[in-house]
Amino acid sequence: MSSHTRTLEAIKFDRENIKLDILNQLLLPYSTTYISISTIEDAFQAIKLMQVRGAPAIAIVGAFSIVVDIFNYLKLENNTSKKVKELIESLDYLITSRPTAVNLANALNDIKEILKNYNESDIINKEIYEKIYNYSIKLYDEDLSNNKKIGENGLNYIINTLKNQKFKGPFSIMTICNTGSLATSGHGTALGIIRSTYESLKKDNSNEDFYLDHIYPCETRPYNQGAKLTSYELDYEKIPFTLICDNMVSSLINTLGNDKKIKNDQQIAPVKFIIVGADRVVKNGDTANKIGTFQLSTIANYFNTNKFDENKQIKFIVAAPKTTIDLNTETGDDIIIEERPANELTTLVGPQLNQQGEVGEKVTVGVATPGISVWNPAFDVTPHELIDSIVTEDPNVFVKDANGNFTLTK
């Protein structure tokens, strides 16, 4: 189904009729098209092709796809052939669709724990279905609840930080990729903090000496999630923002930090926070997130070390549910980094627009010399040394101790 009506509902699961539809995020912001997911294979392809993305969202879609797959199987007349062993193999296969994001692996491993109560030779039955259904519903509901808690906890951290710095006036926040409703069950993680902060600290609402004036989403090459998705969400919610390319970050921070405007119709509001999501946070706090996140942390560190006094210091915040924390992996060196196809870097895909801005057919346009060598990792790892805080649904925000170490818990 397709329309031009805008929506922030990335995952639609019909709990009565057991149907799963996902918003095809490859077509945003120009088209709102939902794809039906009826099998585990459907989910694998949607996740692999990034029609759905964001660590929490792909975990939820993965779990719901198993529910729908089993439900449809049990409706068949000949439903005595599928064994637990086959389902376990399907789960292992589904995990490989996006190996860096720990949420998907965690969810599917939880389902494998459910299956350990059965013999591999057992036939898939209604009891197994109901247990996986209940788990998946809980996963979805808890993610939404946790995202709202992340937003509130991030807001409190921002308020306390600015008060401690005795900061006054307008400030800005920078982010990368998409970490909002389109990447989760709703509200979002990093973008959820931005939502909560703007609602409480926009100029007309703020009871503090400071207010959130502007958001700067990075374009997020090569897949452009910041340009396509985060801008879509910010515009939808009427949160003031200006899109920038990934290679404009240093110049923007420097300009605003030197009390200069970047546009005549904007105030001077220094970037005080860079808030990012996470696909995996390991035991020491090293964080895998969208490629380009690491460089944001090094830029913030440069300005904090060499350029800015405390009033203009930039806090680098990671926002993620505790399901993203991986205590079994010691450091970021052990994280498997997914590499994407070369054509995602050497081509651009999007609809043609005529002079009136009307949307036409989707086309692929080359932007690089054909056949060249390309390196296209989907993620990088930000060292914990460059992270100021990790905000989860726990009201106690994770900050480093006197030795510069995080002590993370699940």
Curated annotation (Swiss-Prot):
SUPFAM superfamilies listed in its UniProt record: NagB/RpiA/CoA transferase-like (SSF100950)
Return the GO cellular component terms, semicolon-separated.
cytoplasm; nucleus
* Superkingdom field: Eukaryota
- Which reaction is the catalytic activity of this chain? 5-(methylsulfanyl)-alpha-D-ribose 1-phosphate = 5-(methylsulfanyl)-D-ribulose 1-phosphate
- Which residues are the active-site ones? 279
Q: In which pathway does it act?
A: Amino-acid biosynthesis; L-methionine biosynthesis via salvage pathway; L-methionine from S-methyl-5-thio-alpha-D-ribose 1-phosphate: step 1/6
Matching Pfam families: IF-2B (PF01008)
**E.C. numbers:** 5.3.1.23
Which InterPro entries does the entry mention? IF-2B-related, IF-M1Pi, IF_2B-like_C, Initiation_fac_2B_a/b/d, M1Pi_N, NagB/RpiA_transferase-like
* GO BP term, example: L-methionine salvage from methylthioadenosine
What GO molecular function annotation could you give as one example from this UniProt entry?
A: S-methyl-5-thioribose-1-phosphate isomerase activity
Q: Does the keyword Transferase apply?
A: no
The entry's localization annotation reads: Cytoplasm; Nucleus
Q: Where is this site: Transition state stabilizer?
A: 177
Question: Which residues pair up as cystines?
Answer: none
Keywords (alphabetical) are: Amino-acid biosynthesis, Cytoplasm, Isomerase, Methionine biosynthesis, Nucleus
Member of which family? Belongs to the eIF-2B alpha/beta/delta subunits family. MtnA subfamily.
PANTHER family with a match to the protein in the record: METHYLTHIORIBOSE-1-PHOSPHATE ISOMERASE
Q: Which NCBIfam families match?
A: eIF-2B_rel (TIGR00524), PRK05720.1 (NF004326), salvage_mtnA (TIGR00512)
Please give the function described in this protein's UniProt entry: Catalyzes the interconversion of methylthioribose-1-phosphate (MTR-1-P) into methylthioribulose-1-phosphate (MTRu-1-P).
Q: Give the protein's recorded name.
A: Methylthioribose-1-phosphate isomerase
User: Per the UniProt entry, what species is this protein from, by scientific name?
Assistant: Candida tropicalis (strain ATCC MYA-3404 / T1)
What is the phylogenetic placement of the source species in the record?
Eukaryota, Fungi, Dikarya, Ascomycota, Saccharomycotina
Which gene specifies this protein's sequence? MRI1
